């Protein structure tokens, strides 16, 4: 009975979404986008289950395991107003260290008119965000898995750029009969290293 109570309690607690940002005050919203069609279709930030989709796994590194050895994932999405998103991920397993994955996520906001104060168009410029991900996942025992992501983030708008570092920490539990799994995750913990405001806008 205690096992069932514990499992139900974990499910209820893990289903509550907590956010560290208030709408409008967050930066690097590219970190909230879904590189995987699977997570986007389910409306989730990450999948708490084990999958063969490396682009979904990279958002929850504790589900990265040896079964994903040499997996490659590529996604491309066309959004509204000329915005497009692409991602590439690859995983490799090392016996003693665990499973590693490399990922790149690209969000292109399209082309914009460059204007003078009076509104005259003098050219065009582009804006884009890039997220580079190094993932690590390891099985502690047959049911418990842990993982972490290191994510450098680069924003490049016209000739201005900004840089940040973020990490994700996660732990997952999978039932012995493999019928259900839960994950606990802290995402996008980090700091902006270089801001747009630190540059000369004249």
What do the PLM-derived regions correspond to, one by one?
Residues 21-43, 47-53, 69, 77, ...:
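Outer-membrane beta-barrel porins/channels
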């Amino acid at each position: 009975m205690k096992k069932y109570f514990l499992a139900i309690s974990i499910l209820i607690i893990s289903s509550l979404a907590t956010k560290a940002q208030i709408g409008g005050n967050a930066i690097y919203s590219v970190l909230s986008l879904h590189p995987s069609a699977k997570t986007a279709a389910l409306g989730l930030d990450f999948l708490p289950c084990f999958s063969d989709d490396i682009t979904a796994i990279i958002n929850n590194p504790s589900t990265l395991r040896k079964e994903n050895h040499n997996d490659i994932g590529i996604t491309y999405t066309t959004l509204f107003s000329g915005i497009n998103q692409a991602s590439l991920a690859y995983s490799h397993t090392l016996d003693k260290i665990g499973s590693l994955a490399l990922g790149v996520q690209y969000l292109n906001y399209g082309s914009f008119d460059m204007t003078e104060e009076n509104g005259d168009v003098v050219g065009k410029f582009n804006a884009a965000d890039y997220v580079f991900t190094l993932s690590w996942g390891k099985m502690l025992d047959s049911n418990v898995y842990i993982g972490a992501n290191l994510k450098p983030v680069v924003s490049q708008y016209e000739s201005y750029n900004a840089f940040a570092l973020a990490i994700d920490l996660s732990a997952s539990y999978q039932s012995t009969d493999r019928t259900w799994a839960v994950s606990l995750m802290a995402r996008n913990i980090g700091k902006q290293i270089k801001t747009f405001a630190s540059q000369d806008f004249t």
